[in-house]
Design a protein with these regions (language model features):
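Beta-strand-loop-alpha-helix segment that lines the small-molecule cofactor/substrate pocket
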Residues: 64, 68-69, 75-76, 80-128, ...
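Structural detector of well-ordered beta-strand residues that form the stable sheet scaffold
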Residues: 55, 94-95, 122, 151-152, ...
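Rossmann-like NAD(P)H-binding beta-loop-alpha module
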Residues: 131-151
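Short, Asp-centered acidic motifs that coordinate Mg2+ and/or phosphate
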Residues: 33, 53, 69, 93, ...
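Conserved SAM-binding strand-loop segment of SAM-dependent methyltransferases
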Residues: 51-58
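Rossmann-like dinucleotide-binding domain that binds NAD(P)(H)
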Residues: 152-200
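Glycine-centered tight turns that cap/initiate beta-strands
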Residues: 28, 66, 144-147, 180
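N-terminal Rossmann-like dinucleotide-binding module
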Residues: 1-49, 172
Length: 200
């Protein structure tokens, strides 16, 4: 008989619901625990998806539950500490939302902890799997549109590099098969949210 993977959701907002829906459609996964600092949010998610155990502290959840997988769908400011704690607790599959963390140093800490404990860390850059991205990648690989030499991406107003810019960077890296970067130029303005400016 195939293994059923025990899943915990950390962060019960919109993306927590999205991840929960996906897990309920996969016969190899079982939602066993959910955590959010907002008690109302975690109870709502647990009721909607029949999740038996609810927590308002991720440390307690990681200590009490034997989880195979966690989805971390919190605000990016706490993803690094939760990822490191999950790896240290023995969780072998960690799915995080984008952006991965609030800084490069935190991202390095996450990777190091997961490598040390043998955990697989995946960041949910779902934009690369769109039909448009897949077709553009095929056209580039086939040489149908020539060899791209420049990528210009304009973000939506107030979208921010940290919030949605990671989709653009990941998408172009995917489409262009991770080419060697020769040089980069960028422009920023002071119209982004304060928390986003602090991370640059």
């Amino acid at each position: 008989m195939a293994k059923t993977y025990r899943v915990g959701i950390i962060g019960c907002g919109g993306m927590g619901h999205s991840h929960s829906r996906a897990y309920t459609k996969n016969p190899a996964t079982e939602l066993v625990a959910a955590m959010d600092i907002n008690e109302g949010s975690v109870k709502t998610l647990a009721e909607e998806f029949s999740i038996p155990a609810v927590y308002t502290d991720y440390r307690q959840m990681l200590e009490k539950e034997e989880l195979d997988i966690v989805s971390i769908t919190t605000w990016q400011g706490v993803r690094a500490e939760i990822t490191v704690a999950a790896a240290n607790a023995g969780v072998k599959g960690i799915l995080g939302e984008k952006p991965m963390s609030a800084s490069l140093g935190e991202a390095d800490d996450m990777i190091e902890a997961c490598e040390k404990k043998g955990a697989k860390l995946v960041i949910g850059h779902n934009g690369r799997f769109s039909a448009t991205s897949t077709e553009i990648r095929r056209l580039v690989a086939d040489g149908a549109i020539g060899q791209p030499t420049l990528v210009h991406h304009r973000a939506k107003p107030n979208a921010g590099l940290l919030n949605t810019g990671t989709h653009a960077i990941d998408g172009w890296r995917y489409i262009l098969s991770d080419p060697e970067t020769l040089w980069v130029i960028g422009q920023t303005s002071r119209t982004t949210d304060r928390w986003e400016r602090r991370t640059m």
